[in-house]
Amino acid sequence: MSDIYARQLEALRARSLDRHLREISSPSGAIVDLEGKRLINFSSNDYLGLANDPQLREAATKAIAEFGIGAGASRLISGTQSPHVRLETALAKWKETEAALCFSSGYAAALGTIPALVGKNDVIILDKLCHASLIDGAKLSGATLRIFPHNHLGKLKSHLEWARQKNSAARIVIITESVFSMDGDRAPLPEIVKLKMDFGAQLFLDEAHAVGVIGRNGRGLAFEENLSQEVDVQMGTLSKALGVSGGYICGSRNMTEWLINRARSFIFSTAPPPALAAAAKAAVDFLLSIGGEKRRQRLWRNIDILAEELSIQPASAIVPWIIGDEKETLAAAQNLQDNGFLVPAIRYPTVAKGAARLRFTLSAAHEATQLRSLAAAIKRLPKRDRTKPIRRLRSARGRPVAEQRTGH
């Protein structure tokens, strides 16, 4: 049996597609220790620098003292502890929905929620670049699945017309992300909402890379566009801008009650540690504070700095730098690491074949000098590796008013 895996691994190595784990021996932050070397970290999704924040650490420490380490059971048995309830109450208030439900991860949230809400007589229409968790959840549901090219409104409309003609009474669910994880661009949400309403569909929106970054108090793209009430299911994560771990679903109380009864990844998983729930609650509280708004504005200031240095227009804290060839992408990542920067080489199957890239993620924890040093290092890359990045313009509405350049 092991020989089979050895051959398969060798085949991956031959195509520069093998992956391995690298041990970080320091807390998550703008600077990390990797294999004995200090590196400026441009690989983390810790957009607000909260993963090692003193307020979150204190909240977790207090919860450990009061509730211990583990929950000891699934949520439906005896694993629902006060920190879980407080977190879900805070999430619902923050997202202005009736209720919220937390899962052990964002992947678990998608994998449990989509099959619980959608079945074999329904139709799912999904953006081609959606996260693997959304694709897997859609496949697991048994619904008819139609995929439209990335952000292609014409194809989305065609699929909606087909679905409605096929069965006028069918439940149709559009699934998309608000900010896409590999390209960093935004969904055309106003247009998608209009199509949703025109065809009587529902909208499932994954705000994983938008919450904490975009919208009033970091509530996400739906809030920036004043469309949150038109989103039927709001999904998000606690592990990126909020700096902790886990996923959540926000929506109607009836929907979350249904998920408690039918979402298998929720029912059959041990509850997240109460300390993580307490830390996530502290992160939500921080986002609603003046300090949280200042932290977001600092992040956008950092995005502006790199944008100016590289003459790009990022729509989020994710900046892709397309190279194409896997070997050249790995070489570029190693070049940057040799110069003191930790940047991931993203390859197939995470992205399409021929679309290998460097993926820079920015944080409020970065200093201006670190960003300018990164830009200089990118410009020094061998010519074959200096491919232009994806230039995804911001939506017409741009950032929230408080985040315009004049506010920095």
Task: Report the location of each language-model feature.
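N-terminal "arm"/small-domain region of PLP-dependent enzymes with the aminotransferase-like
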Residues: I4-I69, A201
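Conserved N-terminal alpha-helix of the aminotransferase class I/II PLP-enzyme fold
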Residues: E58, K62-G106
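Conserved active-site segment immediately N-terminal to the catalytic lysine
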Residues: G200, G220-L238, E257-N261
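Conserved PLP-binding catalytic core of the aspartate aminotransferase-like
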Residues: L50, R295-G340, T350, G354-A355, ...
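Conserved PLP-anchoring active-site segment centered on the Schiff-base-forming lysine
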Residues: T113-A132
